[in-house]
């Protein structure tokens, strides 16, 4: 996912193609949205301590969805690569064109059938076909047992959710809570990305620091992750890397996210399974010049209003990428590296944390996963970019929190302090990224560890 965006006016996301859009539940009492559907369909699960262990996908053969019973998920160790299936009886009246598919031919002919019926726009139909082929090729690269079955299982659910959104566009609230029932969008996203991750060549840096975070969250503190941003799969990769060691963090991160991942029909079902604070992407702020000022004001309201409310609540963990978008490779060397941070955006976030009235902690986080779902080489204005997908190793790493007062003690002005703190966080992210790059792309594995970045491997591989 890219990082991200801020709409404070709900009407900014209304679709003009459907008179009865589905609406996300919002924790804000001021939200102007009123769900037109049964509240049981969209009711989010309130997540809190004790830590929730989450789960394996549903039994695909029976077409059932995993749901929460007594606030406990099935053991993470039972999870597989097949995506969560829609529960029986959900989405009354929704076509079963894709969910009933039993072969690749059924899926692809279903796209053509809905296109001819006028229920699936041509550009979306073409994008779905392209996505299928790319996803299939990537999963087959893994040489996993039953890879073709995994592709069919995951893609029929993905197409089913995408087609449902085409017919009944879901509208995100400025603050969106992950939808876990009656369809578990969180596990759907996890298990869709899972077979794309080469766990044998994936690494976590300083896993003990994530344990420190969990203890701080249990005490009611707030945690902010200042991160680079690589792909739309970032949230799933973070959660997969931590799902066996730090499940509470995996499930409860709130991502500051851009408007593109909540408007593209092929992205929206995955976004519905994440906790999101929605803003307008900095890199697309001027795509339509006459809307630029409105977008800036909306972002300010979202970040200073809703973000402040979230932080004052305590026990929240928030992820934000101060670069304002995804990393891109150097046009000359073709090497990937974290995009520079915007010092003002980062300073605004720090001030919100400081003024929230509870103990706050700011950590630098590095992500390396661009091979799985690389963005276009150039920033594009149009919604609906091509989906390049591959099977590859990934990595995340976190460093100990960086204290503003310690970093800026010798600074002579607020502007100098702002720049120094931003640079300190960025330098830490870059240092960690280099270690991850050496481990994954340099082939050094665990030997890439340094005195400041201790690498381990996800327990999915070790088990």
UniProtKB/Swiss-Prot annotation:
Give the Pfam families listed for this entry: Acyltransferase, GPAT_N
Q: Where is the composition biased (Low complexity)?
A: 24-37, 74-90
Q: Please list the reactions this protein catalyses.
A: sn-glycerol 3-phosphate + an acyl-CoA = a 1-acyl-sn-glycero-3-phosphate + CoA
> What's in the keyword line of the UniProt record?
Acyltransferase, Chloroplast, Lipid biosynthesis, Lipid metabolism, Phospholipid biosynthesis, Phospholipid metabolism, Plastid, Transferase, Transit peptide
Subcellular location(s) per record:
Plastid, Chloroplast stroma
Cross-referenced SUPFAM superfamilies: Glycerol-3-phosphate (1)-acyltransferase
Q: Where is this region: Disordered?
A: 18-37, 65-95
Q: Which GO terms describe its biological process?
A: CDP-diacylglycerol biosynthetic process; phosphatidylglycerol biosynthetic process
Indicate what this protein is called per its UniProt record.
Answer: Glycerol-3-phosphate acyltransferase, chloroplastic
